[in-house]
């Protein structure tokens, strides 16, 4: 199919383009009875929206969400929830010079090869602008998970170019424009971004996303393993080129005696697996990292070709994020929440009546 829908029981279908009239989504499968308002959703949209600092794109969108259906008298009804965000600050003329050119490392070339036509204005459907609706849908999932099951999904920027985070203070994440959990690293990030802006270049980043309070048992082996679904969801985010669950690629250098998460009656002694064993949640924190590439929408000229195959020099004049990772934290949170929400409903549907006397092992013995 066309790939615009995610989920099996809790489904999200998004629509809209970067410079179109609006963005929208349909959330189907949300259980009835969840207290929900536009403000509940707006909180996360405001964390993601552009134009809030000198370090992100200066395109200014209010991203005011409208709930069109599925909510009555402040509660979800169990019917499809329709949501809409109007685009108000498009500047399509910035892209007229590249309408027949393929920007290097963008989806321009591949979209033309696949569809034979493309919306060149701001990348059209391939733009990260689309993720606003993922955040809106994810806000619903996050609220249901927390209100009804005590599951909390949070994230932070763990690396910006060469600046790595060593200390995590959750209270600091929303206190700076980087979603940085270490206040002592913010000045270094600011200086790095100032230099980058002067050079007209861009940089990559790493985001860490964590879900706490997840019960054991979520995940559907074999092909819908929880970690496989999380990787799928996170890789679907624009610019993501790598996903790690738990220790990820660091396991290459670990020995089995260190990597195995030993178990005691008091709880697990470590969490190298990132809260997932055999594709099923273990009850520990679910931890994932994503690596986002540097955007190639630059003021620095780059070589490419046009739609006729002629060599051209491409310079992007539009407004862009010099580091797409700065605003990606709410997006990563949303995608992890959507996976957990879908699997929670799937687990309840198939295994809700399962009874056993196996004790629940505490997430950590520490």
Swiss-Prot record:
Cofactor(s) the record lists: FMNH2
- Which protein is depicted? Chorismate synthase
Q: Which residues bind FMN?
A: 125-127, 238-239, 278, 293-297, 319
Q: Gene encoding this polypeptide? A: aroC
Relay the cofactor remark from the entry. Answer: Reduced FMN (FMNH(2)).
State the organism named in the record.
Cellvibrio japonicus (strain Ueda107)
Lineage here is:
Bacteria, Pseudomonadati, Pseudomonadota, Gammaproteobacteria, Cellvibrionales
> What is known about what this protein does?
This reaction introduces a second double bond into the aromatic ring system.
Please cite one Gene Ontology biological process associated with this protein: aromatic amino acid family biosynthetic process
What SUPFAM superfamilies does UniProt report for this protein, alphabetically? Answer: Chorismate synthase, AroC (SSF103263)
Assembly and partners are described as: Homotetramer.
The pathway is:
Metabolic intermediate biosynthesis; chorismate biosynthesis; chorismate from D-erythrose 4-phosphate and phosphoenolpyruvate: step 7/7
Keyword Flavoprotein present in the record's keywords: the answer is yes
Q: Which InterPro entries match?
A: Chorismate_synth (IPR000453), Chorismate_synth_AroC_sf (IPR035904), Chorismate_synthase_CS (IPR020541)
């Amino acid at each position: 199919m066309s790939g615009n829908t995610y989920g099996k029981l809790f489904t999200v279908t998004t629509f809209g383009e970067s410079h179109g009239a609006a963005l929208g989504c349909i959330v189907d499968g949300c259980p009835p009875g969840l207290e929900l308002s536009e403000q509940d959703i707006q909180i996360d949209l405001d964390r993601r929206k552009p134009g809030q600092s000198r370090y992100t794109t200066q395109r200014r969108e209010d991203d005011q969400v409208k709930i069109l259906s599925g909510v009555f008298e402040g509660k979800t009804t169990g019917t499809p929830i329709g949501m809409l965000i109007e685009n108000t600050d498009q500047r399509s003329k910035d892209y007229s010079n590249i309408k027949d050119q393929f920007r290097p490392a963008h989806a321009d070339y591949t979209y033309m090869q696949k569809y034979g036509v493309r919306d060149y204005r701001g990348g059209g459907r391939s733009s990260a602008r689309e993720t606003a609706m993922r955040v809106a849908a994810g806000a619903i999932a996050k609220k249901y998970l927390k209100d009804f099951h005590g599951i909390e999904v949070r994230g932070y920027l763990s690396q910006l170019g060469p600046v790595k985070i060593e200390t995590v203070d959750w209270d600091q994440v929303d206190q700076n424009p980087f979603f940085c959990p270490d206040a002592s690293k913010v000045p270094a990030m600011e200086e790095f971004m100032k230099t980058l802006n002067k050079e007209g270049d861009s940089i990559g980043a790493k985001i860490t996303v964590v879900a706490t309070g997840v019960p054991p048992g979520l995940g559907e082996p074999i092909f819908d393993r929880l970690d496989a679904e999380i990787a799928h969801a996170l890789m679907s985010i624009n610019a993501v080129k790598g996903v790690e669950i738990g220790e990820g690629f660091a396991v290459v250098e670990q020995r089995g005696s260190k990597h195995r998460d030993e178990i005691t009656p008091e709880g697990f002694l470590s969490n190298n697996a990132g809260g997932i064993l055999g594709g099923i949640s273990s009850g520990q924190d679910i931890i994932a990292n994503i690596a986002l590439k540097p955007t190639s929408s630059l003021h620095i000229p780059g070589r490419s070709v046009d739609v006729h195959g002629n060599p051209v020099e491409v310079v992007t004049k539009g407004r862009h994020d010099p580091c797409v990772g700065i605003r990606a934290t709410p997006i990563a949170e949303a995608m992890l929440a959507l996976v957990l929400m879908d699997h929670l409903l799937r687990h309840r549907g198939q295994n809700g009546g399962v009874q056993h006397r196996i004790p629940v092992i505490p997430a950590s013995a520490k």
